[in-house]
Amino acid sequence: MKKQNLIEMEGIVTESLPNAMFRVSLDNGCQVLAHISGKIRRNYIRILPGDKVKVELSPYDLTKGRITYRLRMKTTNG
């Protein structure tokens, strides 16, 4: 169930940290410490540095977030 007062932004994973934590660089230039949501963990979705992800931020602490979705990278055939 999605909460109403969350801020959702897109960013790129810059660093992988222990305990399923990641440093994410958001599109507006801010750095955020983010952990993986339960659905991503349960479905064994791998997140690597360089992946584009959606992050939910709490309005109370904008330095921490939760990775809710890994966006697909566009592949070019050529």
From Swiss-Prot:
Q: What highest taxon heads this organism's lineage?
A: Eukaryota
The chain positions of domain S1-like read: 1-72
PROSITE patterns, alphabetized: S1_IF1_TYPE
Q: Name one GO cellular component term.
A: cytosol
**Matching InterPro entries, A to Z?**
NA-bd_OB-fold, RNA-binding_domain_S1_IF1, S1_domain, TIF_IF1
Pfam families the record matches = eIF-1a
* SMART domains, alphabetized: S1
Work out whether the entry's keyword set contains Nucleotide-binding: no
Q: Which UniProt keywords apply?
A: Chloroplast, Initiation factor, Plastid, Protein biosynthesis, RNA-binding, rRNA-binding
Q: Where in the cell is it found?
A: Plastid, Chloroplast
MF terms (GO), sorted A to Z: ribosome binding; rRNA binding; translation initiation factor activity
Q: Which cysteines are joined by disulfide bonds?
A: none
Q: How does it assemble?
A: Component of the 30S ribosomal translation pre-initiation complex which assembles on the 30S ribosome in the order IF-2 and IF-3, IF-1 and N-formylmethionyl-tRNA(fMet); mRNA recruitment can occur at any time during PIC assembly.
Function per UniProt: One of the essential components for the initiation of protein synthesis. Stabilizes the binding of IF-2 and IF-3 on the 30S subunit to which N-formylmethionyl-tRNA(fMet) subsequently binds. Helps modulate mRNA selection, yielding the 30S pre-initiation complex (PIC). Upon addition of the 50S ribosomal subunit IF-1, IF-2 and IF-3 are released leaving the mature 70S translation initiation complex.
Family membership: Belongs to the IF-1 family.
Q: What is this protein called?
A: Translation initiation factor IF-1, chloroplastic
Species of origin: Chaetosphaeridium globosum (Charophycean green alga)
Q: Which gene encodes it?
A: infA
